[in-house]
Amino acid sequence: MASPIRILTAVPICDGHDSAINTINLEFIRHGIEVVYLGYHRSVGDIVRAAIQEDVRAIGISSYNGGHIEFLAEVVTLLRKKGAADIKVFGGGGGTITHEDATMMRRKGVDEIFFAGTSLDEMVKFVHQRYGKPRAKRSRAKSSDIELAHKLTEIEDAKGKRPAPNTQPASAVDGLRRGEHPTSKPETRVIGFTGPGGAGKTTLIDELVLRFLNKDRQSRVAILSHDPSVIGEGALLGDRATMINSQNDRVFMRSMATRGQAGGLSPATHDCLALLADRDSIM
């Protein structure tokens, strides 16, 4: 089965209008799209960092407070600067965005702008048609975060495919046990959190991240955040929306859908853990 389309959605800094993007998120999910939701009042740097780490196909930005031309153009510019020009940008908003504004944003590299009155079906169709095709062969990653994000995607995609008869796909965990991951740290802390929805898991993790970063100014932290999903359906991966301290260049966070596996973990979790073994702490 083909892997779901992954996109990131967000609301720009100094903008708290999130009702529209929440409605759109739910429609995307209903049509099999995995949505990493970053929340509102997010800076260009936060959005680009998250998009790279999540290895999404595109970023959808909902803007209602003005400044959209400069903001979306800066997102495109920073993606290119970081070597992630394959991540595309689209957006929309209310009456603050004119057709003239949309023309300017397209010239600056934005794929599409949706106006008030655009149907949800039209937005879903656009995402499926524009970002649902297989990725082209990607050039060598220009940063360690991009390289890591690509490898995590490869692991997740491989877990979604059925192995050929009488074959067993190699596990990154097996390689770690055999000493094939020379960058792994024997003292890496791996901490798991579980509990019902609303128990405060994300808040606790975010507070621990703050303390780990403050205790050791050189430490690096990784987070594998899980949300339930059914095979063939989308998922709302929204833990980033409530995290404050984890918006840091020393924190690598990946949002994972369970993709039909029971128990709260993704089929790719164990192999992804092995790939992150060079971090000081993994949560």
Question: What residues fall within each predicted segment?
Answer:
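The Walker A (P-loop) glycine that initiates the GxxxxGKT/S ATP-binding motif of P-loop NTPases
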Residues: 11, 195, 255
